[in-house]
Swiss-Prot record:
Cofactors required: Zn(2+)
Binding site for L-isoleucyl-5'-AMP: E581
Biological processes, Gene Ontology terms: isoleucyl-tRNA aminoacylation
Subunit field text: Monomer.
Ranges where the record places region Disordered: 1-21
SUPFAM superfamilies for the chain: Anticodon-binding domain of a subclass of class I aminoacyl-tRNA synthetases, Nucleotidylyl transferase, ValRS/IleRS/LeuRS editing domain
Similarity comment text for this entry: Belongs to the class-I aminoacyl-tRNA synthetase family. IleS type 1 subfamily.
Protein name per the record: Isoleucine--tRNA ligase
UniProt: ATP binding residues: K625
Motif 'HIGH' region per UniProt: ranges: 66-76
InterPro entries referenced in this protein's UniProt entry, alphabetically: aa-tRNA-synth_I_CS, aa-tRNA-synth_Ia, Anticodon_Ile_BEm, Ile-tRNA-ligase, Ile-tRNA-ligase_type1, Ile-tRNA_ligase, M/V/L/I-tRNA-synth_anticd-bd, Rossmann-like_a/b/a_fold
GO MF term set: aminoacyl-tRNA deacylase activity; ATP binding; isoleucine-tRNA ligase activity; tRNA binding; zinc ion binding
Gene name in the database record: ileS
Stated role: Catalyzes the attachment of isoleucine to tRNA(Ile). As IleRS can inadvertently accommodate and process structurally similar amino acids such as valine, to avoid such errors it has two additional distinct tRNA(Ile)-dependent editing activities. One activity is designated as 'pretransfer' editing and involves the hydrolysis of activated Val-AMP. The other activity is designated 'posttransfer' editing and involves deacylation of mischarged Val-tRNA(Ile).
Length: 945
C-alpha cells in the first residue's frame, strides 16, 4: 500500500504523516459495481460463504418466487435487496444462511405471451415447449438484473416451479391433501375471467372503478292472497304491484331464482301510482323520491313473515321462457344501506346468493347458469342469447322497461372486480371446480383447515406486527380455495374421474404417484401425452383424464414442500425462519403457503413473516405508466450505482410506503459520500499500520482511543439488535450519525493532529491507529449487509489477504476497562466541546480569531464537568482543537462559561498551533517545540488525546 507523503514545500521540509490509499474518494459506482459482480461470480464468493458457514445453526429465508415474465422493476429491487440484507446480516451474525432464489414459472401470463407470439391454435405440447423456453429466457434476464443489484445467492442452481422434480413433488403434495380428505369437487360461484377463460384466485383480483347501469325492478305479485295475509290484511287493496329489488348487474336478472329479505327488517306495503310496492320501511321515503312516486304505507311486516311468498319473474310478460316465480328466502346479509332492502338472487353469480339458495334446498342441477366461460349467454337464453353480458346490460334494461317492471335506471360508478392480468371486469360464475375445504376436518380427525391455519397465524412472528391481524382476518373469512384452473401451462390435477359420476378413480393415490414418477423424468408433458390405458387399463372406458391444472398459487404455495424439503433439501430446511414479501402477499404467497402447510403438516411453513410496503413517488403517488413517475432500477444503477438503491432501501422504513424521487436519491447520494469519505480517512490513516507489528495493547491506549472503541462497541450492540429485528433504517441512521458526528465531527477531528504530527512510530500515533483498526473492522462489517459493494471494496484495501468480507462475522471489539464510565465521561466532554465550539464560532464571526487553533480558551466549569476537563491536563487543547486550553473551577452552573482570546504567539508552520516555543530552536525558526521533538527527538508524551 502506498505510504506517499503530500508534496507541498513545507511538508517536504517538515513532513507530516499524510498518507494515501487506493480507496478513491469517488465511488464511480456504475463502472466499478459490474466488475465486483463479475469478480464475485468468478471467485465463487457465495460458495466461500457457504463453506465458511458450514456447521453453524441454520437460518432460512425462503425466497418467494417472482413471476418469470418481464424486466425487473423497482418493487423487485426493494424485495430482493431487503432479502439480501437479511441473509448477509444473518450470515455475519454467525448463522449458516443460504439464499436459494426461485421463480414462479407456470400460469396465464406466460400462456398469453405464447398466444401473442404464435397464436391460439398451437397444440398443447408446443405451448408447453415454448412456455418453458420463454420462462427460461425471462429467468436469465431477471437473474442478471438481481445480480447487478449486489444480491448474492445460489444463482447457478435456483429453484423453478417448472423444474421436473418440483412439478412431480407438487403432484405428490396434491395426493397428500386428497388422502387427508381436504379436496372435493363442487359447483360454486368462483372469480371468473372471460379473457383468461378460467377461475381466478383471490390474489388475482383487483378493484377499479367502473360505471354500470343500476336498476330498481318490480317482481309482480304471484300469490296476492298469501301476500295480504303476511301483511295482516284480508286482501290486497289492488292487484297491481309487487316487490322491488335494486341491482348494479342487470345481466343477472335473466338468471334470477329467488329474493332475499332480512328476517328482522320491517317491510312496508306502499300504495303508489305504479301499484302496491314492497320495500324496506326505512327506505320508503328514499325510494319514493328516486322512483318519482308518491306513496302511502298500507301495512308493514317483518321479513320473517314474508318467507316463501312467490313473485313473478319481471320478464315473464316479455317471453314465455321467463314464466317462473321467485320464492322469498331469508338472509342476514341483506342491508338497508342502499337500495330497497330486497336482494334478487341469481345463485350462479353470487356467493351469498348461492349459499342462500343451497341452504333452502336448491340442488346443483336446479341452478340456472346461462353465462358461458367467454362471457356470452348461451344461444338458447330467451331475448338475449349469444350476447356478451356487458352488451346485454342495456338490452335487459330496455326489456324490463317494455315489460312494465322497471321503476328506475341510472348510471352508477362503483368499485368493481377486475382481472389483475387483463385489467378487464370479472364476475362470480358457478362452475364445477375442485376445492380445498376450509371447514373440512381431515380424515384422521382433528381441527379443520381454517382452525389449523388460524393457529399457524398465532404461532408466527410478524414484522411489522399489524400483519398478524390482517392475515388472521383473511383466513377467518375466506371461502373454500378453488384449486382448479382451466389452462394448459400448469401442473395438472393428474387424476382420473368417472365419466358419468365425476368420482375419483379408487386407485387415485397410487396413480398420482405413478404420474409423479413420469413427470419427474419428463415434466408435466408426460401427463399430456399419457394414454389412460397405460395406467388404468380397461378402466379407461369408464374414467377420463382430468383436464384441470392447479392454481399457480398452489405451485408457489407448496414450495415449502417441493423446495425446502424437495429440490433443495440439502441446503434448506422446514419450516423456514422467514418469508419476506410485499404487503399484497397476505392474500397471496403468505396465504397459500399457510393453507398448504396447514393441510400437509398441520402448521405454518414459516416462523416469521416480514412485510414491506410499495414504492411511491416523492409526492406519495403510486407508480404508474400514465403518471410517468416510474423509476427503473437499471437506469438508477447505471447512473448513480446500485449501492445508492441499496442505501435508499436500507434507510427507508419499509413497513410503510417507500418514497423515491430525484431529490430523495440526491440526499441518499450525499449520505453515501459522507460514509465513503469516512472510510477513505480510516483506510488512508491505516495504510502504514500492520496490526501484528504495530498494535498497542488496549491498556496502553490513550483515553480518547479507549473511549472511541468502547463507544463503537456499544453502538454495534445497538445495531445488531436492530438487525435482529429486521429494522434496517435505524441501523443506517445511526451509522450515518456515527460517521458524520461521532467520528467525523469529533473523534477523527481530534485525532488528526496526533495522526499527522506525532512521530510515525510513536505510541501516541500507534494507539490512534490501533483504535482506528478496530473501528474499521467493526464498521465495514455492519455496513456490509447493505453497502455491499463499498464494504467489499474497502475490505480488499484493508485486508487484502482475505477472500471477501462476507465470510466474516460481526467484529468482537476488545474489552475496554470501565467502558460505561468512559462513555459517560466523554459524552460530558463532548457536550462541553459543543459549547466551546459555539463560543469559537462567535469569536470568528466577530473577527477576533481566524481558525480555532488561533484561539486560547478558558473553560469555567463546576462539578463533574470540571473533573472531566481537568483530568485531561494539557491534552484538553487537542480535544477542543485550540492552541491552549485552561479549565477554571467554579461553584455552580450559573458561573460556567467559555472565554476565548486570540493567541499572542506565532503559528507553527507544521502543526499550525500558536505556541510560545515557536522558533525556540534557531535552526528551525518556524517550528514549535513539540514538532521539533516529534521530528528530531523522542516525541511528545500524550495520555488522554
Amino acid at each position: 500500500m502506498s505510504n506517499k507523503k503530500a508534496d507541498s514545500k513545507p511538508q517536504a521540509k517538515y513532513p507530516v504523516n499524510l498518507l494515501d490509499t487506493p480507496f478513491p474518494m469517488r465511488g464511480d459506482l456504475p463502472k466499478r459495481e459490474p466488475q465486483w459482480v463479475k469478480e464475485w461470480e468468478e471467485r465463487g464468493v457465495y460458495e466461500k460463504i457457504r463453506a465458511a458457514s458450514k456447521g453453524r445453526p441454520k437460518f432460512i429465508l425462503h425466497d418467494g418466487p417472482p413471476y418469470a415474465n418481464g424486466d425487473i422493476h423497482l418493487g423487485h429491487a426493494v424485495n430482493k435487496i431487503l432479502k439480501d440484507i437479511v441473509v448477509k446480516s444473518r450470515n455475519m451474525a454467525g448463522f449458516d444462511a443460504p439464499y436459494v432464489p426461485g421463480w414462479d414459472c407456470h400460469g396465464m401470463p406466460i400462456e398469453i405471451q405464447i398466444e401473442k407470439q404464435f397464436g391460439k391454435s398451437l397444440p398443447a405440447a408446443e405451448v408447453m415447449s415454448k412456455a418453458r423456453a420463454y420462462a427460461t429466457e425471462q429467468i436469465e434476464k431477471q437473474k442478471a438484473g438481481f445480480k447487478r443489484l449486489g444480491v448474492l445467492g445460489d444463482w447457478a442452481d435456483p429453484y423453478k416451479t417448472m423444474n421436473f422434480v418440483n412439478e412431480a413433488e407438487e403432484i405428490r403434495a396434491l395426493g397428500k391433501i386428497i388422502e387427508k380428505g381436504y379436496v372435493y369437487r363442487g359447483l360454486k360461484p368462483v372469480n371468473w375471467c372471460f379473457d383468461c377463460g378460467s377461475a381466478l384466485a383471490e390474489a388475482e383480483v383487483e378493484y377499479k372503478d367502473r360505471t354500470d347501469p343500476t336498476i330498481d325492478v318490480m317482481f309482480p305479485f304471484a300469490e296476492p292472497e298469501k301476500t295480504a295475509q303476511a301483511f295482516g290484511l284480508p286482501a290486497l287493496p289492488r292487484a297491481e304491484g309487487g316487490i322491488v329489488i335494486w341491482t348494479t348487474t342487470p345481466w343477472t336478472i335473466p338468471a334470477n331464482q329467488a329474493l332475499n329479505l332480512h328476517p328482522e327488517i320491517v317491510y312496508a306495503l306502499v300504495d303508489t301510482e305504479r301499484g302496491l310496492l314492497i320495500v324496506a320501511e326505512e327506505r320508503v321515503a328514499a325510494c319514493m323520491e328516486e322512483f318519482k312516486l308518491s306513496g302511502r304505507v298500507v301495512a308493514t311486516a317483518p321479513g320473517v313473515k314474508l318467507v316463501n311468498l312467490r313473485f313473478h319473474h319481471p320478464l315473464a310478460s316479455a317471453h314465455p321462457g321467463y314464466k317462473r316465480t321467485a320464492p322469498v328466502y331469508l338472509g342476514d346479509y341483506v342491508t338497508t344501506d342502499t337500495g330497497t332492502g330486497v336482494v334478487h338472487s341469481s345463485p350462479a353469480y353470487g356467493v351469498e346468493d348461492f349459499i342462500s339458495c343451497k341452504t333452502h334446498g336448491m340442488t346443483d342441477s336446479d341452478i340456472i347458469n346461462p353465462v358461458m366461460g367467454d362471457g356470452r349467454y348461451i344461444e338458447s337464453l330467451p331475448l338475449f342469447g349469444g350476447l356478451s353480458i356487458w352488451d346485454a346490460n342495456p338490452k335487459v334494461v330496455d326489456a324490463l322497461r317494455d315489460a312494465g317492471t322497471l321503476l328506475r335506471s341510472e348510471k352508477y360508478t362503483h368499485s368493481y372486480m377486475h382481472c389483475w392480468r387483463h385489467k378487464t371486469p370479472i364476475i362470480y360464475r358457478a362452475t364445477s371446480q375442485w376445492f380445498a375445504g376450509m371447514d373440512v376436518t381431515p380424515r384422521e380427525g382433528g381441527k379443520t383447515l381454517r382452525e389449523t391455519a388460524l393457529e399457524g397465524v398465532e404461532a408466527t412472528a410478524f414484522y411489522p406486527s399489524w400483519g398478524k391481524q390482517r392475515l388472521f382476518s383473511m383466513i377467518a373469512n375466506r371461502p373454500d380455495w378453488t384449486l382448479s384452473r382451466q389452462r394448459q401451462w400448469g401442473v395438472p390435477m393428474a387424476f382420473f374421474v368417472h365419466k358419468e359420476t365425476g368420482e375419483l378413480h379408487p386407485r387415485t393415490l397410487e396413480l398420482l404417484e405413478e404420474v409423479a414418477k413420469r413427470v419427474e423424468k419428463s415434466g408435466i408433458e408426460a401427463w399430456q401425452t399419457l394414454d389412460p390405458r397405460e395406467l388404468i387399463g380397461d378402466d379407461a372406458n369408464l374414467y377420463e383424464k382430468n383436464r384441470d391444472t392447479l392454481d399457480v398459487w398452489f405451485d408457489s404455495g407448496t414450495t415449502h414442500w417441493h423446495v425446502l424439503r424437495g429440490s433443495h433439501k440439502d441446503q434448506l430446511q422446514f419450516p423456514a425462519d422467514l418469508y419476506l414479501e410485499g404487503s399484497d402477499q397476505h392474500r397471496g404467497w403468505f396465504h397459500s403457503s399457510l393453507l398448504t402447510a396447514s393441510m400437509l403438516d398441520g402448521r405454518a411453513p414459516y416462523k416469521g413473516l416480514l412485510t414491506h410496503g410499495f414504492t411511491v413517488d416523492g409526492e406519495g403517488r403510486k407508480m404508474s405508466k400514465s403518471l410517468g413517475n416510474g423509476v427503473d432500477p437499471h437506469e438508477v444503477a447505471n447512473r448513480l450505482g446500485a449501492e445508492i438503491i441499496r442505501l435508499w432501501i436500507a434507510s427507508t422504513d419499509y413497513s410503510g410506503e417507500l418514497a423515491i424521487s430525484e431529490e430523495i436519491l440526491k440526499r441518499v447520494t450525499e449520505g453515501y459520500r459522507r460514509i465513503r469519505n469516512t472510510l477513505r480517512f480510516l483506510l488512508a490513516n491505516l495504510s502504514d499500520f500492520d496490526y501484528a507489528q504495530h498494535a498497542v495493547p488496549v491498556d496502553e491506549w490513550l483515553e480518547i482511543d479507549r473511549y472511541a472503541v468502547a463507544f463503537s462497541a456499544q453502538l454495534q450492540t445497538e445495531l445488531l439488535a436492530y438487525y435482529e429485528k429486521y429494522e434496517f433504517h435505524p441501523v443506517v441512521a445511526k451509522l450515518q450519525t456515527y460517521c458524520s458526528e461521532d467520528l467525523g465531527g469529533f473523534y477523527l477531528d481530534v485525532l488528526k493532529d496526533r495522526l499527522y504530527t506525532s512521530a510515525p512510530d510513536s505510541r501516541a500515533r500507534r494507539s490512534a491507529q490501533t483504535a482506528l483498526y478496530h473501528l474499521t473492522q467493526g464498521l465495514l462489517r455492519v455496513l456490509a449487509p447493505f453497502l455491499s459493494f463499498t464494504a467489499e471494496e474497502a475490505w480488499k484495501v484493508f485486508q487484502p489477504a482475505s477472500d471477501t468480507i462476507f465470510t466474516e462475522t460481526y467484529y468482537a471489539y476488545p474489552d475496554v476497562a470501565d467502558a460505561d464510565a468512559l462513555i459517560d465521561k466523554w459524552s460530558l466532554l463532548r457536550d462541553v466541546r459543543g459549547t466551546v465550539t459555539k463560543a469559537l464560532e462567535e469569536a470568528r464571526t466577530a473577527n477576533r480569531i481566524g481558525s480555532s487553533l488561533q484561539a486560547e480558551v478558558t473553560v469555567h466549569a463546576s462539578g463533574a464537568r470540571y473533573d472531566a476537563l481537568a483530568s485531561l491536563g494539557d491534552d484538553l487543547k487537542f480535544v477542543l482543537i485550540t492552541s491552549a486550553a485552561t479549565v477554571v473551577k467554579v461553584d455552580d452552573e450559573a458561573q460556567e462559561g467559555v472565554d476565548v482570546a486570540a493567541s499572542k504567539y506565532q503559528k507553527c508552520e507544521r502543526c499550525w498551533h500558536y505556541r510560545e516555543d515557536v522558533g525556540a530552536h534557531a535552526d528551525h525558526p518556524t517550528l514549535c517545540g513539540r514538532c521539533f521533538s516529534n521530528l528530531f527527538e523522542n516525541g511528545e508524551i500524550r495520555s488522554a488525546a
